[in-house]
């Protein structure tokens, strides 16, 4: 049995700094709008758990590996995770920052089943958006998505020859969308849904984000959220041994604790 390790590391500090800088600009830009009525500015945090299903293809160099992981598979192979969101809002303008970090592993088959392989994926996704309220129930959203993915593949062929490769890439995508929220009846329940689309060839070819959740408010500062989250990334860059592909759908139920501060 022969092992041929190959390591490809690709980093891009500028997009990462750009995403953080853009988030800061969004936050600063919203402040003047509330200078006349500071009491109208509200802060909200959300910490949540996600049970994602992963379905797609991860490619490093000339090797593509299919990934198909259920929520139970994800939890079995989860090495670490953090999921949180901040939302600040005034009378019209606001800001939202959503961060998801996951470290997972998967097994799959590629090239029509001729090869078997293992894939390790570490992913950080951060979304920073400015919001503008059109009505009591509807807001427009525009901002940037920063995605950092590190992947490793161990591939075994028909002759039991093993080839290992690892690579990583990060990129920034513009995103636009809308958010809808409404109370349900006169009680403590409410519904929130959002749809965002981005990429447009700037980083990824296309990014789609859909979320929906029902909230139950326990008191005047906290509530529980139960919902569903869908993310679809279509990204490919480079060629030959420098090629990196991340064509992945991540979707599943989410439950979280929302609190005002």
What are these regions (language model features)?
Residues 76, 196-208:
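Solvent-exposed loop/turn segments connecting transmembrane beta-strands
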